[in-house]
Amino acid sequence: MTTIKPFLNDQFLLETKVAEVLYHDYAKDLPIIDYHNHLSPQEIAQNRQFETISQVWLAGDHYKWRAMRTLGIDEHYITGPADEKEKFRKWAETVPYTLRNPLFHWTHLELRRYFDIDELLTPDSADRIYAQCNAQLQSGELGARDLLVNMKVETVCTTDDPLDTLSHHQAQQIEGHAPQLLPTFRPDKFLMIDQPDYVSSISELSTLVGKEISRWEDLVHALQTRVDFFHGKGCRLSDHGLAKVYAHSSSPEALDGIFQKCLRREGVTVREVQ
């Protein structure tokens, strides 16, 4: 007789004996070095205490938001003013439809690993799981930093705006808390010249570095100044959210001409953006 494994078990995703040995005997207890995420440096540095699982899961997870929107959930329950329990119930309605999507696996792995809950999240189990998670979160032992330490996370590299002061990274380093909290340089906003807030971003950067930015070369130098600042705070990575890899070559003079158009708030063509 064939024994059917439950959805989550100690051999989850381990389909061969070799896989089981490699994971359990070698990989399982190794520290995690998370070199890309969208976690909040402030929440980690301050070890934010969460009152509800909705605050952990639904307050800023655009993957969950997209799944809920795809299912037709009203925005009121996604980023709107609905209360946290209502939002969680709507997420519970969505979860069964994410089968074969990583969201389904992530949801149940997190319930099992962080909260010791093996039950599948469905509309029927939603209120019960909501209460169980909240009780554990409100114990004072599952703050933002605690959750990472419990999973043996050794290093966290957050995604950071070049304008960021990195004060929370510095506070974490000074206080000596685990995990190591390092910044990642994400300069997208200074390359997206077609965005309506582009000029205001340039103005903020100019103020921060204490130099006027009126030419393309000035922008390059200003960003280099911020790279140096980030480097001094432990940054060794950059992150670029490019929709595609651009291949149009351009001279420094042409780049400066496009930049001047942006500063004058004139429209730019698709070719100029690329």
Question: Where are the model-predicted features located?
Answer:
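Metal-cofactor-binding active-site regions of metalloenzymes
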Residues: 2-274
